[in-house]
Amino acid sequence: MNRYLLILVPILVLPACASLNSAITEGDSQVLVRQMQTRVYESLDKGDTLRSVLATLQDLGFVIDTADYEMATITATRLQEYELRVTVTVKDRNSHQLAVRANARVDDQLIDDPATYQDFFTVLDKAIFLTRHNVN
């Protein structure tokens, strides 16, 4: 009987260790995804930032689904070969910085390709520059 317990206990404990490591790895990857989805901008009004996000999404061929200025969230869709849906949220980071986070999905699958977010933020950087300098 004791022999069976010695065999059974490690068999029951090992899967628990594996799932814990998996959860830690998934948490780490979520942090990395969040980092590539977020860019911080200095000394710009939240309304101006939201207008720049709207312009950027439209320049990239997206149709705006919802724009909630109170919640500082914009959702847009681009239909080509597939449905690409983006939600962008703007929130205060501190008194002189705003964090812009873009979350892109294709058919309910999160896009975790850094190039996708880099392309979006490159265009947004230009739009914010133009807004900051009052260029239409």
Model-predicted segments: where are they?
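Positively charged n-region of N-terminal signal peptides that target proteins for export
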Residues: 1-4
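C-terminal motif of bacterial Sec signal peptides marking the signal peptidase cleavage site
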Residues: 13-16
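Ser/Thr-rich, low-complexity intrinsically disordered terminal regions
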Residues: 18-136
